[in-house]
Amino acid sequence: MNDSEFHRLADQLWLTIEEHLDDWDGDSDIDCEINGGVLTITFENGSKIIINRQEPLHQVWLATKQGGYHFDLKGDEWICDRSGETFWDLLEQAATQQAGETVSFR
């Protein structure tokens, strides 16, 4: 994967997250902000999830209250380089815990 392909795929990821949060109709207040290559999700309780792109490594990094995760693209899925879990699974787990209600991005 070259840098432009990586950015295109990361942009798609950001857009999917942003669209799901724009359509969010849960009880919790969840805000999303993109600044440069960093996407910040802020929850009503003040906690945050930070997602950023690591261009030199062609990775997406996810920082949550539960920990930090690094994802490589394998096929058409972003996969955690430690646990083998998908980006979407870990993001949904963290967002659900931090929002206090079920949050889905799929």
Curated annotation (Swiss-Prot):
SMART domains: Frataxin_Cyay
Keywords, in A-Z order: Iron, Metal-binding
GO cellular component terms given for this protein: cytosol
Pfam families: Frataxin_Cyay
Entries under InterPro entries matching the protein: CyaY, Frataxin/CyaY, Frataxin/CyaY_sf, Frataxin_CS
Domain of life assignment: Bacteria
Keyword Metal-binding appears in the UniProt entry: yes
Stored PROSITE patterns: FRATAXIN_1, FRATAXIN_2
GO terms under biological process: iron-sulfur cluster assembly
Keyword field contains Iron: yes
GO terms of molecular function: ferric iron binding; ferrous iron binding
Family classification: Belongs to the frataxin family.
The protein's role, per its UniProt record: Involved in iron-sulfur (Fe-S) cluster assembly. May act as a regulator of Fe-S biogenesis.
Entries under HAMAP family matching the protein: CyaY
Descriptive protein name: Iron-sulfur cluster assembly protein CyaY
Highest classification ranks of the organism: Bacteria, Pseudomonadati, Pseudomonadota, Gammaproteobacteria, Enterobacterales
Gene from which this protein is expressed: cyaY
